[in-house]
Amino acid sequence: MNFNNLDFAAAILNVSLLWILTVPHEFAHAWVATLLGDDTPRREGRLTLYPLAHIDWIGTTLLPAITSLFGGGFIGWGKPVNTNPSKLRWGAKGLALVALAGPASNVVLAVILAGAALLAVRLVPAFSEYAARGVRLSLYLAIFNMLPVPPLDGSKLLLSAKVPYAVYAELARFGLILLLVLLTATSLGRWMSLWSYQATEQIFRTLHG
């Protein structure tokens, strides 16, 4: 193995950005679930912006660091927010809204970061570049989290669509392996990266006028 080819800068940047982006993402799940009548996130301490409440040490640190180091795509997620579907207003539709809240927050964050990057481009170029990277990563996470594979948000849409729980449980058993296969042995990872770059460019063009 040639350790000279390891991208330590990408690993540090991606993990630090993932920590920043994970907090509002998971908080959005907790907040929407609470609005819809489920007190589970509040009781479990997830209705907070405290970072460590939402960090999954494997999904938010270890895996993204490894995949960034070796340049093999990007895999990362936060600590899943537990919900009780029986307490949610509107039942399956409520569960779908909770699931969509996280990716939606990533899109909102991408727009905010893009605005910050444009404002800082002359005053603090280094921050502008960091924020622009955050835009791309936030949009990537929005679409990545929609994959219907546990523990990602898209898998909750399977439950809201009344997919048998036994099927969901089987997916959950092999979720990590399935994600690794999808992102390394297919063109899915490259497609998501391309989409996030194109969406980022579109946001910057729109904001810049």
Where are these regions (language model features)?
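Hydrophobic transmembrane alpha-helices and their immediate loop junctions
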Residues: 1-209
